[in-house]
Amino acid sequence: MKKKAIACVIGAVFSGQLYAAQMPVAQAEIEPVVVTADRNAQTLDKAAPNVSVIGRKTLNQASAQNLDDIVMYESGVSVPSDNNRRGHAGINIRGIDGNRILMMVDGVRIPESYAGGGSNGAISGRDMVESDTLKQVDIVKGPYSALYGSDALGGVVNMVTLSPSDFVDEGKRGYFGLKHGYRSRDRSHGVTATVAGFHENAEGLLMLTRRQGHETENMGSDTSYSTARTATNPQKNNAYNILAKGNIGNERHRLETLYEQYYHANDTVLANSLGSQSRGPVTIATSESNARDRIRRQRIEAGYRYTGEGRLKEANLTAYQQKLRTEDDAVDASITRMGARQLGNSTRYSDYGFNQTIRGLNGRGVWEFDGAVKQTVVAGAEYKHTETARPRDSLTVDNLTGAVSKVYAGSTYPNKTFPDSKRKTFSVYAQDSLTFGNGIVLTPALRYEKDKLNTSTDQAYLNANPSGTATRFSDSAFTPSLRLSVPMGEQFTGFATYSQGFRTPPFDSATMAFANTTYGYAVIPNANLKSERSNSFELGMKFKNERARAQVTAFYNRYRNFINRTEIGTSTVGRRPIIQYQYQNLDHVKTYGAEASAAYKFLPGWQVSGSIAWMRGKQQDGKPLDSAYPFNGVLGLDYTQEKWGVGTKLRWSKKHSRVSSDTVFQAPGYGVWDVGAWYKPFKNLEIGANIYNVGNKKYWQHADVAGMSRTSVMDLYTESGRNFAATVQLKF
């Protein structure tokens, strides 16, 4: 028995992505967790090894404030970020990121990100869900198109918000909560108030959040207002969120309504853009550069839910609308010279936007059939209508004459980098989970999806692309998947999965037209893009007993027609060389790797846990895929009592040495130590504190610098040094 216990400890230390352990302080007991990855609630034990869950306790005790905090301790998952202005772009899962990752809130797709031609941040990112409103976050690592459609080519992230039933029921008809949090890295304060009520067949929830903060500090030491600056740019930000839910009905029939509004604003002094910069024979001296970025997301839902006792166990129908409105405005004052001759002295005012409206209707049913082979069938249909636009306007004022111009850097304004688009997507899907008498579970699934994209040109788009025409694109696909689960004794279960993926060209790739003669680059449209497709294989093993949990998985993904921005040549405007880029299909890209995780409660109150993730990514020319992460992991130790707990986590990564070019920055390896504690002195009060990067280590997150060329200011992209967070929660 002792040998078995020791083996479990060793496995936990060297294996892991602990269950429920993405936090500096973890609850020690191994308990079941419900996940919705298969569109049907089930315990984590029955889910494939590539599924993980981050729960509310984890989020609370990790002081999660944004997308990066949520996945901080999730090996193999990262968040590309630009802390100098834009913030968090989205999620990277197993080297695949951007809109190839399906991100949802309560099973409804959130708006797409827009990178604007490419950077590790995004002009419009996807960090637009308030973390204090989340009950849990389900993550599926790898393609999942059979159930979720073309957006799930690289994985799925479903953020599940809290519901009235999480606070009130017949036994407790009212709830009030207040939470305050502080984070030193950005000097931010956040306050969330929660009110919930229950009366007969009705229940309601209202959550209000307000946050205020500043720039996220890094380890850069140059604070000059010049291009040599390595400290993050000065910034003020504020945000608010409203989540309201109202449900009425009984145990069988229920009507559900939801309203959510998220707002985030950044005001940034672009200090690292000030001073003189050379562009060939031209020198630009910038004396003022300020940015104002705004994100507004609104979600409205209404639905009906049926819960039965016969073969039809559950059915629901949901109609929703989600609107995204972003503004990225800037003011820049500069003097342009060629040698000793002054070419211009002007101030530019830019007013850009990215807008997307999604309207949809989802229907789903769950049936159970008993017999020699037990069956659980999930089937449904979805319709989604998406409208996307990128309006841009700019005004340049000559500071000497007062003359006003609508032309800047070779572009006439107003313009649009891609035409307004309307996309209609219809899909049907079905999954049948067959459980045999010997415990073997075979789960085939199939989805059919039809996608139509129509664009419309106007003068604004023609200003950017004079030869542009309206474009129509239509494609459809069947995407199957097959999963096998085989019990191997009482404590072990083996898994094998095959799945296909499908993704139509996104709203901007085929039609983007953009040129910047000042910085010497242009993006050329490509109307011949094909839909991306993938074949994915996964093998895994799970282990569980009353005190321990472990899992290991290996994966191989092969992508065809992978859409990638490619340098296609050089043109000349005047005497200036212009590098031309275009989105093109790569014949094949492949990723493969392995992940392991474990958690072990080796003594009452004590838990050791850990996770590791290793992968490789290759492009069609054999060069490494820069977005593929280096070998990384997490190791944790926690002690928990009824009213208090302490814990520590070690986050580590090897050097990112596999890059596509010798000029690409290779992020050094690192080990970062975090500690935390929580205390519940009274039933209604809980306090928590965490210290991050205790050793004040200078390090880079791979996702923030993936594919970035080495420069003299790489410290600009470093993570925060030693910092702390504290929270206080009142619950009545």
Question: What is each residue range found by the language model?
Answer:
Residues 21-167, 187, 509, 539:
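Acidic, small-polar-rich N-terminal luminal/periplasmic segments of exported/outer-membrane proteins
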Residues 165, 173-179, 183-190, 194-293, ...:
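Periplasmic-side early beta-strands and strand-to-turn transitions of outer-membrane beta-barrels
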Residues 177-180, 227-232, 284-291, 303, ...:
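Extracellular loop and loop/strand-boundary signature of outer-membrane beta-barrel proteins
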Residues 180-186, 199-201, 210-214, 250-252, ...:
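Transmembrane beta-strands of outer-membrane beta-barrel pores
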Residues 249, 254-262, 295-460, 469, ...:
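Face-selective signature of the C-terminal outer-membrane beta-barrel domain
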Residues 349, 358-367, 524-530, 536, ...:
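Outer membrane beta-barrel strand-and-loop segments of large Gram-negative receptors
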Residues 437-438, 442, 450, 555-559, ...:
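Gram-negative outer-membrane beta-barrel transporters
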Residues 502, 558-561, 655-659, 679-732:
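C-terminal beta-signal and adjacent terminal beta-strands/loops
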